[in-house]
């Protein structure tokens, strides 16, 4: 009955409003409270209802609502280890969609997740090959929110990579290129044995959007598209433990652009992460 009342388009009764406010306050008070609520009311757990409840919550208490959303993002990445563990296909499909994969998780270290084709037109796949990601771990996730104009989210992903024949040739090619400012060191010893293994640190920072992008509003909670768009500028910083990769990041005119990049006015869909935390 509570779900039916909530989905009535025109709320004419003060009793109905009271019931909805009670549901909303439980869901937005904390992620654990939302999990307990939907565990006890499984019939109400669907994307449209979750979006409507969160939209109502944003209009009544935006700080609690956004903090609950960010907690869901953190929980799904760090506690559920979405990037590290093998995917539960059914759960992932229910949250992210039938045609999505790990490359669609935000953030992640991949050609798509790093926006490589936007920085390196026609070279995105080659840059991704250089890193040859074997494993990535979300090792840090911090956030603070005051308003759509004042917030910051920092996500630290540690990556383990391995130089293989393909990535070795790509690195050599970049190092031999004139854009590397005369650096053409391609000694085999730099790419074999333990030296073929390396780590990298990627820091993803999310701050209020610039460039004319609209900030978060109640219209960001969209039941038509089944999305909760969180507008932000995204900054990506990277460093690695591999001498030759660092050489590229420091000296190669193309690759060094990857060391620190900013993308203005991006929309991060937070619904899949919050919804994943509820299943």
Swiss-Prot record:
What's this protein's family per the entry?
Answer: Belongs to the MG439/MG440 family.
Recorded protein name is Uncharacterized lipoprotein MG439 homolog 4
Report the membrane topology from the UniProt record: Lipid-anchor
Keyword tags: Cell membrane, Lipoprotein, Membrane, Palmitate, Signal
Q: The organism's lineage?
A: Bacteria, Bacillati, Mycoplasmatota, Mycoplasmoidales, Mycoplasmoidaceae
Q: Give a yes or no for keyword Membrane in this entry.
A: yes
Lipid attachment, kind N-palmitoyl cysteine: 20
Q: Where is the signal peptide?
A: 1-19
Highest taxon in the source lineage: Bacteria
Q: Which is a Pfam family this sequence falls into?
A: Lipoprotein_3
Q: Name one GO cellular component term.
A: plasma membrane
Q: Where is the lipid attached (S-diacylglycerol cysteine)?
A: 20
Q: Is this entry keyworded Signal?
A: yes
- Subcellular locations according to the entry: Cell membrane
Read off the InterPro entries from this record.
Answer: Lipoprotein_3 (IPR001595)
């Amino acid at each position: 009955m509570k779900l039916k009342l909530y989905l009535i388009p025109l709320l004419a009764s003060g009793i109905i409003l009271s019931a909805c406010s009670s549901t909303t306050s439980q869901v937005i008070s904390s992620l654990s409270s939302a999990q307990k609520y939907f565990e006890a009311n499984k019939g109400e757990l669907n994307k449209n209802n979750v979006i409507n409840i969160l939209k109502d919550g944003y209009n009544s208490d935006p700080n609690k609502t956004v903090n609950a959303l960010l907690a869901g993002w953190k929980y799904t990445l760090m506690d559920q280890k979405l990037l590290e563990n093998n995917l539960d296909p059914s759960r992932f499909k229910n949250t992210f969609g039938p045609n999505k994969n790990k490359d669609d998780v935000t953030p992640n270290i991949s050609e798509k997740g790093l926006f490589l084709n936007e920085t390196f037109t026609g070279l995105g796949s080659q840059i991704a090959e250089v890193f040859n990601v074997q494993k990535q771990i979300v090792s840090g996730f911090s956030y603070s929110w005051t308003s759509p104009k004042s917030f910051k989210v920092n996500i630290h992903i540690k990556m383990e990579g391995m130089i293989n024949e393909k990535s070795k040739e790509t690195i050599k090619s970049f190092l031999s290129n004139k854009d590397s400012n005369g650096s053409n060191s391609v000694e085999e010893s730099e790419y074999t044995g333990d030296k073929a293994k390396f780590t990298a640190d990627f820091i993803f920072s999310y701050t209020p959007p610039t460039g004319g992008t609209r900030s978060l509003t109640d219209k960001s909670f969209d039941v038509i598209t089944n999305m909760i768009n969180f507008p932000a500028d995204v900054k990506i910083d990277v460093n690695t433990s591999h001498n030759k990769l660092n050489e590229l990041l420091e000296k190669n005119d193309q690759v060094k652009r990857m060391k620190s990049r900013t993308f203005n006015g991006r929309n991060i869909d937070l619904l899949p992460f919050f919804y994943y935390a509820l299943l």
